UniProtKB/Swiss-Prot annotation:
The gene is ODA7. Residues 173-211 form the LRRCT domain. Disruption phenotype: Absence of outer row dynein and a reduced flagellar beat. Axonemal outer row dynein assembly is prevented by blocking association of heavy chains and intermediate chains in the cytoplasm. It is found in: Cytoplasm, Cytoskeleton, Cilium axoneme. This is Leucine-rich repeat-containing protein ODA7. Residues 297-332, 368-432 are annotated as: Disordered. It comes from Chlamydomonas reinhardtii. Belongs to the DNAAF1 family. SUPFAM superfamilies: Outer arm dynein light chain 1 (SSF52075). Residues 212-243 form a coiled coil.
Length: 432
């Protein structure tokens, strides 16, 4: 729903964002996502430096009052189809007009101090739609990503911006239409320090310039030259550090009253034998030489000594055979060998289990379990009372005192029956 930008609405915006009620005291104003359809009633905000109008329904920038101090204007995500009305803000430094309906960039020459222009996700297609950029002489950062630019001639327009440093063109067909896109842009715009997704370093610029002048051969020569220069710098740094260390040792020897020298004084007390290392066994040297005669296994790391030995054979002109380290078929992997050993161990275990007889409880064990009271301990009895196991029992004939004998007989009978059942079970199993 559209809303009007009135003084009352602007005052409410100031309240919501903790700004001053007095308009002239504010140097920024957040009017984003308010549904405003036009710019109005900003005359009292004469000291604004940043104005946020993102996410409204503006169709034009007309209505901006003279704001001499305004540096940043954010009007992305609106419905603007034409740039106009910027004459009132000649000191504008940054303009974000992305995600609008622009088909042409214009009306920017009235902002001679404009250094950053962000115009992504619009409808810029032809060279004419961006030709006006040649008049923005102070422009340093230009973002035209995700438009519809496809003519390689845009490079000629960008060349006319003398101080262009950051350029973003990803998301446009022109990136694919320009052969050797990055090299062309780097050599065409000498001031460029950042292109799309990464910086432009000095070495890249030198390589691109060599490619422009000498093609691929010139590029290779420049890469080799840069590599040699880097190695030379590293060598000089190493020599300088060694000289500093030797000078420090000489100074230390002088303070300690030791003879002159370039070595660490702490090593003077060590004998020459402490620096000697045991020689490698002849068997190890011979094995390494044999292995070095074969190429490395694909996908496996090999010891550094083996790689060095193979390089030595190559330098001596000796042949290096293709294939595995050993003779014959390629050796099995460690995982396959381990799996086979596990299967063999499992098979042996299964055979042993089949040969072992079944272990069943004996009758004596069952009798002992029946004699053992519940819980492994006899229940505590009160003084003067008869234990439950020895309490008198009345037989069918009326006699007393024979209950314990009856219980014992019952246990033995149960045990005998259990033993007979176990024997029968064993016989049946033997038949199986």
């Amino acid at each position: 729903m559209c809303a009007c930008m009135t003084k009352e609405a602007l005052l409410e915006v100031c309240k919501q964002n903790g700004l001053y009620r007095t308009a002239s005291l504010n140097d920024k104003l957040y009017c984003n996502f308010k549904g405003f359809s036009q710019i109005a009633c900003l005359e009292d905000y004469v000291n604004l430096k940043a104005l946020f109008l993102e996410g409204n329904v503006l169709e034009t920038l007309e209505g901006l009052p003279p704001l001499a101090d305004l540096k940043c204007l954010y009007v992305q995500q609106n419905c603007i189809w034409k740039i106009s009305g910027l004459e009132a803000v000649p000191g504008l430094d940054t303009l974000n007009i992305s995600n609008n309906q622009l088909t042409k960039l214009e009306g920017l020459a009235c902002c001679p101090a404009l250094r950053t222009l962000i115009a992504t996700h619009n409808h810029l297609v032809t060279l004419d739609s961006v030709a006006h950029l040649a008049e923005c002489k102070a422009l340093q950062t230009l973002d035209l990503q995700n438009n519809e630019l496809e003519d390689p001639g845009i490079v000629d327009i960008l060349k006319q911006i003398p101080d262009l440093r950051c350029l973003y063109l990803k998301g446009n067909p022109v990136v694919s239409n320009i052969k050797n896109y990055r090299k062309v842009l780097v050599t065409s715009i000498p001031s460029l320090t950042y292109l799309d997704d990464r910086p432009v370093f000095d070495n890249e610029r030198k390589i691109a310039q060599a490619w422009l002048e000498g093609g691929l051969e010139g590029e290779r020569a420049m890469r080799n030259q840069l590599k040699e220069e880097e190695e030379e710098r590293s060598r000089k740094n190493h020599e300088f550090m060694m000289q500093m260390r030797a000078a420090g040792w000489r100074e230390r020897r002088k303070r300690m009253g030791l003879p002159d020298g370039d070595t660490d004084p702490a090593l003077d007390d060590m004998s020459d034998g402490e620096y000697e290392f045991d020689e490698e066994p002849e068997e190890l040297v011979e094995a390494r030489q044999r292995l070095a005669a074969y190429t490395a296994r694909p996908g496996e790391e090999e010891p550094a000594e083996l790689a060095s030995a193979r390089q030595g054979l190559a330098r001596d002109g000796k042949p290096i055979q293709e294939g595995a380290w050993g003779s014959g078929a390629a050796a099995e992997s460690d995982s396959a060998i381990y799996l086979q050993s596990v299967k063999a161990a499992q098979a042996e275990l299964d055979v042993v289990r089949q040969q072992q007889p079944r272990q069943l409880p004996t009758a004596q064990v069952l009798i002992e379990e029946l004699d053992e009271p519940c819980g492994g301990k006899a229940p505590a009895a009160d003084e003067g009372s008869t234990p439950p196991a020895l309490s008198p029992m009345t037989s069918p004939s009326g006699s007393e005192g024979q209950g314990g004998e009856g219980v014992a007989a019952a246990k033995k009978g149960a045990a005998s029956g259990a033993a007979e059942g176990i024997s029968a079970a064993v016989d049946i199993n033997d038949l199986d």
